[in-house]
């Protein structure tokens, strides 16, 4: 609690003093201050919120001589405004009225009940169904000389309770953040660690929050253990410091304990296949190069029936395990699902999964005591459906360890289900304040209060009949409204028959309204019964939430099993629908893909040409040549994607596939600059190449696309040659090396482990047809002009390019220029041409009649125009011959 000096309150109203105390505790956070049916913001917060949310900024009076600027949002619509602010990286403190206005002296008591930040979201309205939200803290470890030796990371998915730790090299921070993708990053005040731009909203917290000893103890307390040896975290001092800051911050935002954070996983970078930011981007795993969500590998694979499954699938794609054991277990389960008997078919299983609620996030809200009535009814209905789901699984678990494990984990917590069934109404209201949440029969007192409220109608009918008989007033009516409560209405002409015990309540133009002692007694009982029923229901609901807390571990176990089952079923559906096969694994060096296909591209086109890809101990680098648009990049990407899919545990788009160990996948594909970072296209290219050359191992898969094209021809060729040699001689990795430098096709003569392959194409007139087939050997032509023509480059430009190309080819032939490219003939053909140097030189300039013919569009010619053109062409030919041209 921040203490303000008395001078800070001088001249302020009591309510403003209350607000200023609260704001002082949340200086960098927007404070939503509850006033009646609105959340109000004041002063600078009001100005900022008005700008960000397009709210009306008002001004009401002054406090201590300062105009009070205000902006507000309705309490019933607050979630949509919170969602917008969080998306912008803002944090919001929700300040509620906790006192009773009727009994309060001075301002109603208020306090901040929670702080909504980008990394601590749990409300369904604020969360994306298919994306996890992580809060991450980072703590740098230093040696005795003050040099940074590692960075400890701790990250938490508050919605599920998943907590993870890792320690990384300082230069691996960007890669780690790209993999985790935190929504919010906690760093210490004064820390100099450079967080990559766009990595997440950055929150500075006091440096003492990262104290290692305190963090270790806080982590032990959270996990209810004496030490961290059992988790393998006892030596991760920097990560423990980060975990301490993270847990302190997360608990403060929620205003309570994190009861569902009861497990810890330590991640090791050698546990997963390494994917740096460039690789994740270039392979378009979960986001296209244009920044859209589709078409990507994730969008193709995600046919999950639950949101839990969709989130787990995303996690698997970004965390492919290096060990093939996990992949083989998953593929074994997929095979069992595909071979399931008719009564437990894959379709029937997936149909049952579609009825499953988001148990993972409901459990998180339950642990934070923020679960809503329909969360509990959804949890109840899901648990009730588990026995039938397990029956389907039990019919197909044979020889599938993963399914056996899932089946065992899906045993519903019986006591939890009994409590939910007895306590929660079949179809509860959305909010507890609306009533109708607690089931009838759960609490006798609540049932009695409800009976009083619900039986008002019959009592009024009976009273009206009795009073008509007693008074003889046939048109007497007993009614109710919110302003005056219950009353007996008598028309003006019948008032002389009114008994003495009638007391006037309201006079109208044509009638009088009365109340009797009996009606007054009932009114007090009925109105208080409704209020008491809502209060009783609120108390009972809070009791149910408390009673459910012991079942959180069981709920988390069920959620994890359901998510895994859903992903496996989605993999099986994709394998069946898209004709994919189960890959195999070997401990030997090599990759064998027969008739492989790019999974995403294949789904976008009518026909896809499948291709083989083979690596081994004697074949480590493939030099890929061929025309632009011929399919080189697609072939390279599909090889990497098929490998990644295999290690994730999916079937793959191929006739067959076998993989040896893979530790990392690198890509250097495409051209893009980094203007904000002050890096040119070529600098970006070289930076990515440097990372590959420094880190690739014999078990790495490397994709190099047209390296060296961002500088002069000779510089680029020299770099490409040297990089290819280094990858072969030093790194020894699997390499797909696409290039337009024909000189590189001589590399296999020096290194037998290199091989040439090319993407074929055929000319058709002045056009080109891409065959997209990968063949052994180098290409002999680039077809650059034909591709330019396909792209719509104007015909005059194409003609000029052809003329200059002919000139360059002639110059190259006569001067024996060492600079060659794919416009040139292959070496053997070039040698034959040089042997014929005594032959008459061929003019580089085309015949004028041919030029004229190329400009003709026959469809636009009339018969007379065609005849005139024929004479013109004859004149051109004769004139050309007369000038002595051959």
Curated annotation (Swiss-Prot):
UniProt superkingdom: Bacteria
Keywords: ATP-binding, DNA damage, DNA repair, DNA-binding, Nucleotide-binding
Disulfide-linked positions: none
Record bears the keyword Transmembrane helix: no
Protein's GO biological process: mismatch repair
Homology family: Belongs to the DNA mismatch repair MutS family.
Role, per record: This protein is involved in the repair of mismatches in DNA. It is possible that it carries out the mismatch recognition step. This protein has a weak ATPase activity.
Protein name: DNA mismatch repair protein MutS
Organism: Burkholderia ambifaria (strain ATCC BAA-244 / DSM 16087 / CCUG 44356 / LMG 19182 / AMMD)
